[in-house]
């Protein structure tokens, strides 16, 4: 069986010297338009797994099970139904991933119009894609839209463990840096959790402000704020001139731990 780790290794750069610096990208709202997967996908996925088990759930209990969080409310609802919460959560996420892929294949979401900038960045440094979205969904997006510039692709694992490793936990960013042999660089995202995860991984967080998050009060200080992926090219070129890929001059982009 092919695991997520196997998949990321296949996409990692093969051979050659290790890359000192990289630029990593979030997916939803950065590469793919919109905040993320429609909540209706999770609702229909829940219907799938409840129907399989012959369960009918309504009201507050159903709302707890529809949540994308593996929290006390979800576990309490499962306990009341007499089902294993971890198993139900993973099954629901498998169905959510399947349904989200079907919607993407049907054309419900498109690439952001400035993604061509990623190819230009990739000519300068290795680039990777690291998302809180499900790993099967992230891989589908890369293959479906032929995003061949990425040397590393990682979404989160399905199930409770993958949920716990979501950003702002830096787990998957650390995995990307290790796979690419990188010490530092940039992580481009569209929310505060992206900036926090970047800092925890020893990267500079670049906040991308688009229409969907135009009014967002970030609440944290990013290394840089941009309004288009095309602005990254200048950041990378400026950073490369002094041996680091970073928007600031404080040295925080170096990953030395």
Regions found by a protein language model. Name each.
Residues 1-16, 135, 139-257:
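Asp-based, Mg2+/Mn2+-dependent phosphohydrolase catalytic module
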Residues 3-116, 123:
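N-terminal helical cap/lid subdomain that shapes the substrate entry/recognition surface
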Residues 104-107, 127-128, 162-166:
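Short, surface-exposed loop/turn motifs that are enriched in glycine and acidic residues
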Residues 121-122, 199:
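Anion (oxyanion) recognition and catalysis
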Residues 123-126, 203:
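A short helix->loop->beta-strand "cap" motif at the edges of active sites that frequently abuts
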Residues 131:
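Conserved phosphate-coupling serine/threonine residues in phosphotransfer and NTP-handling enzymes
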């Amino acid at each position: 069986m092919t695991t997520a780790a196997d998949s990321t290794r296949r996409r990692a750069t093969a051979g050659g010297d290790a890359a000192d610096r990289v630029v990593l990208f979030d997916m939803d709202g950065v590469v793919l338009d919109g905040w993320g997967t429609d909540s209706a996908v999770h609702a229909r996925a829940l219907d799938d797994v409840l129907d399989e088990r012959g369960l009918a759930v309504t009201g507050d209990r159903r709302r707890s099970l529809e949540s994308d969080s593996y929290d006390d409310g979800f576990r309490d609802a499962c306990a009341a139904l007499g089902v294993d919460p971890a198993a139900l959560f993973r099954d629901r996420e498998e169905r959510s991933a399947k349904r989200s892929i079907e919607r993407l294949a049907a054309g419900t979401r498109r690439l952001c119009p400035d993604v061509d900038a990623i190819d230009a960045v990739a000519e300068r440094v290795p680039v990777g894609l690291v998302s809180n979205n499900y790993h099967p969904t992230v891989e589908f997006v890369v293959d479906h839209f032929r995003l061949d510039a990425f040397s590393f692709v990682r979404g989160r694992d399905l199930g409770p463990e993958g949920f716990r490793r979501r950003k702002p936990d830096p787990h998957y960013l650390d995995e990307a840096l290790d796979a690419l042999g990188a010490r530092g660089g940039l992580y481009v995202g569209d929310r505060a959790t992206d900036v926090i995860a970047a800092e925890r991984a020893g990267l500079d967080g670049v906040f991308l402000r688009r229409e969907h998050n135009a009014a967002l009060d970030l609440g944290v200080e990013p290394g840089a704020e941009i309004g288009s992926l095309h602005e990254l090219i200048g950041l990378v070129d400026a950073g490369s001139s002094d041996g680091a890929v970073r928007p600031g001059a404080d040295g925080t982009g170096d990953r030395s731990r």
